[in-house]
Amino acid sequence: MDPKPTSMWSSIVKKDPPSKPPVNDGAPAAILGMVGNCKSTKGISIAVVDANAIIEGRQSLTNFADKFVTVPEVLSEIRDPASRRRLAFIPFTIDTMEPSPESLSKVIKFARATGDLQSLSDVDLKLIALSYTLEAQVYGTKNLRDVPPPIQTVRVKRLPEKDLPGWGSNVANLEEWEALENETEEKSNANSKILPLKDLNMNIIASDNVSEVGSVVSHTENHEEDVQEGGKKHRRYPPKKTEIKLEGKMVVEGVDASQGQYDDDDDASDWRPAVSRSTHSKYLRRKARWEHYNALAEQEIQKDQEADKARHTKEANETHAKDSGKNGEDISSILKDMRLEEESLRALQEETEETNAEATLINGEDDIDHDIEVEAEGIDVANQALENLEIASEAEDTFEASSIGDDGSSEQSWSLRALSESSVACITGDYAMQNVILQMGLRLLAPGGMQIRQLHRWILKCHACYTVTPEIGRIFCPKCGNGGTLRKVAVTIGANGAIIAACKPRITLRGTQYSIPMPKGGREAITKNLILREDQLPQKLLHPRTKKKASKPGDEYFVSDDVFLNHHSDRKAPLQPPVRKAMSVFSQKRNPNDNHYSRSMH
């Protein structure tokens, strides 16, 4: 037999190509193999670590997770010899990985919405995007937010103020203080030498008591008030009279009139106090007026007492008449019932015999009792059904209220959703990264417990004209046009839902005022002259043309990232204004005339 012919290249071409393994978009094979087993005894299977977590955590990171991943740029950020030595001797390995482009774009969009984009570096954005990628591969993106929750505005007339420390309910041992207060109110120690507060009367005594030297006596008439008709009738009372007893003499409003008022001796009736005639006449007029008021008050009290007695007697007579009428009605109803019973018994005796009558009566009573029991059971069942219906309706109301209240837009719900039980976490101490991670719904671990307590939304506020803009990437104020006056402030949602805009201290102008260099002309002048207003920038720089997509109305027309990260592949870069130099001048106390690269004159 002839040997088999050798395989020609045409036969190889005709064969079907070998099947390629399925590739998941946005997820490399390393990610799929790493997140294959999500079960972990430590609670976290994969942890995305930052440079500050590696430096601060050191060997304690071993107890946090089973595997550690990061981006390659994080390892290059650790430059000092001590940190490099610690990184070389850590008891675990840190794998490097790149996030997917889709997750990176979502993180950038989310950070721009929260106002943290300018505070995050490229490495920080990649770390958050890597956490987003791993979380999406394990649990999906349903539990993650694409847009931060909207800020709810609630108009509050007056914010509730907390009690000072140690006052009111703001004490550490409130229960002990309440128990002590209740104990002192219930029983008082008679043997104690310390008087309670209710017995401290500041030396003010009643008219029936006599105090020592220097005491003040206040004479007031105590009358009984009518409880039922209180406030309906206005009573006239004599004015209060204040007397001071000084060494046996009674002084009335600064006048020593004790002898003329309280001297009961007949021999001394001709004596008068050593005062002027006008003072004595004033005293007599006051005394007459006081006696007149007392007489009127006594007459009104007598009239009121007589009226009260008449009313009480009238009410007693009415109640007695009602009771007698009720007793008569009860007696008549009893007699009527007895007559009806006698007539029914007579009719039964005439129709049937005594035995049959007794049997029918017994059966009738049993049926009546049975019917009554059935009706009672039916009433109980109906009442129980109504109670169950009310309880169900209350439960539905509470469920609806709770579901409406927790709609995911409050600060409390942000914190609860952020503390998820995911097996993928990000370990970082950067506050801007923590703000974005918590609002997205990712799990966060802070090295050393350095974690933010409140979630913030950042805006820019001009300290020259107090204009607020949500465009966090702006350099110049959109209203007054000043550069460097936009300051980053936080818009916090408090516990009651009110928006609270943070305030920063005023800027110290010392060291910021200096002469500006003269503008220069020529082709390269655009790269040398300072930029102090937004209209100094060329139109093509403010509104760059893009061939990929048309600009939308909601897009930002000026972003500093586009200015700083605008790289060209041409041999000679076009001339552009020094926006970076303007930023350095606006953000720091730097003199633009100072040239750090000049040769020393010494």
Swiss-Prot record:
Residues 48-134 form the PINc domain. Zn(2+) binds at C462, C465, C477, C480. This is RNA-binding NOB1-like protein. Keywords: Coiled coil, Cytoplasm, Endonuclease, Hydrolase, Metal-binding, Nuclease, Nucleus, Ribosome biogenesis, rRNA processing, Zinc, Zinc-finger. It comes from Arabidopsis thaliana. InterPro entries: NOB1 (IPR039907), Nob1_euk (IPR017117), NOB1_Zf-like_sf (IPR036283), NOB1_Zn-bd (IPR014881), Ribonuclease_PIN (IPR033411). Disulfide bonds: none annotated. GO terms for cellular component: cytoplasm; nucleoplasm. The gene is NOB1. Disruption phenotype: Delayed pollen development with reduced nuclei content leading to reduced pollen germination capacity, and pale seeds with arrested embryo development at the globular stage in homozygous plants. In heterozygous plants, strong accumulation of the 23S-like precursor P-A3, and moderate increased levels of 35S/33S precursors and 20S pre-rRNAs. Alterated leaf morphology and inhibited inflorescence elongation leading to a loss of reproduction, seeds abortion and slightly reduced siliques size.
